[in-house]
């Protein structure tokens, strides 16, 4: 089965970017809280 590299990269970015954004917001909020 041929894997579309561009589709895989696009999917990975689509998942990783919001996850990283939420993680950064969480860390900033946690550091401000304490």
Swiss-Prot record:
One GO term of the biological process aspect: photosynthesis, light reaction
Disulfide partners: none
Bilayer disposition of the protein: Single-pass membrane protein
Keywords: Chloroplast, Membrane, Photosynthesis, Photosystem II, Plastid, Reaction center, Thylakoid, Transmembrane, Transmembrane helix
Primary residence: plastid
Segments passing through the bilayer: 5-25
Cellular component annotations (GO), alphabetically ordered: chloroplast thylakoid membrane; photosystem II
Superkingdom of origin: Eukaryota
Pfam families: PsbM (PF05151)
Locations listed in the record: Plastid, Chloroplast thylakoid membrane
HAMAP family in alphabetical order: PSII_PsbM
Family recorded in the similarity comment: Belongs to the PsbM family.
NCBIfam families xref list: PS_II_psbM
Quaternary context: PSII is composed of 1 copy each of membrane proteins PsbA, PsbB, PsbC, PsbD, PsbE, PsbF, PsbH, PsbI, PsbJ, PsbK, PsbL, PsbM, PsbT, PsbX, PsbY, PsbZ, Psb30/Ycf12, at least 3 peripheral proteins of the oxygen-evolving complex and a large number of cofactors. It forms dimeric complexes.
Job description of the protein: One of the components of the core complex of photosystem II (PSII). PSII is a light-driven water:plastoquinone oxidoreductase that uses light energy to abstract electrons from H(2)O, generating O(2) and a proton gradient subsequently used for ATP formation. It consists of a core antenna complex that captures photons, and an electron transfer chain that converts photonic excitation into a charge separation. This subunit is found at the monomer-monomer interface.
Protein name: Photosystem II reaction center protein M
Native organism: Physcomitrium patens
């Amino acid at each position: 089965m041929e894997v579309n590299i561009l589709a895989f990269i696009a999917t990975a970015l689509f998942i990783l970017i919001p996850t990283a954004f939420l993680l950064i917001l969480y860390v900033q909020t946690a550091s401000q809280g304490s």
